[in-house]
Amino acid sequence: MKSNVCSIHMKILCLTAFVSFFAIQIACQAMAKNVEVQAEYLQHRMFDDRFINNYNLHLFQKAHEHAGLTLHRGLTVTRAHGYTTEKGVHRDSNAVGLGPAAMIRWERPLSEKLYGDLELSGSFLIYNKAFPAQGRPWGFMWRVGPRLTWKYTKNNSFSLGYMLSHSSNGMKNKNPGHHAVGFSLGFNHNF
């Protein structure tokens, strides 16, 4: 049993090292032409036995743009707080996660300075402990939702979005995923 646990932790460590190396290589090759910061508070929804809220911070950089679609790469930091109940047992589910992120955005102008966006993003997160309770110390966060962006100068914009999030480790066993929804505030600056 102990060797299984060590093997799992070694696989997670190797995967984390690979993903980190890949992210660092991309960051070193990219010229930072813009930065976008998104902060959000998402409240639990849809599952009766999972009461987990997320405080998320996403840092994105535009990597590619074509015909109204933009691809972004970045980093996600999350602070999840709450609990799960399974078969009447209350388990705290508090954790901090960090990992690489990618986002696809479809943007259309509504007026000269106002744009309507649809976003889809995914993050691979390593948590400081098994999360949610009885889960694993790693997982994925998927987000989708509309966003309004106000470009108040040539180089700066504010945005407000409404996001639906699904967090899960993607495994068939030990996969206590959860959903959350809420508002996301963003700021973008072009250099």
Model features per residue range: what roles?
Residues 1-33:
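Cleavable N-terminal export/targeting peptides
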Residues 26-77, 184-191:
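Short glycine/proline- and aromatic-enriched beta-strand/turn motifs that initiate or cap beta-hairpins
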Residues 31-35, 65-73, 94, 112-118, ...:
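Outer-envelope beta-barrel architecture signal
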Residues 33, 49-55, 92-100, 136-142, ...:
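Residues that define the transmembrane beta-barrel architecture of outer-membrane proteins
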Residues 34, 147-191:
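Predominantly the C-terminal beta-signal and adjacent terminal strand-loop region
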Residues 44-52, 110, 131-137, 171-177:
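Solvent-exposed loop/turn segments connecting transmembrane beta-strands
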Residues 55-63, 75-77, 100-108, 120-124, ...:
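Residues on the lipid-exposed face of transmembrane beta-strands in outer-membrane beta-barrel proteins
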Residues 76-94, 129-134, 172-175:
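Flexible, solvent-exposed loop segments that connect beta-strands
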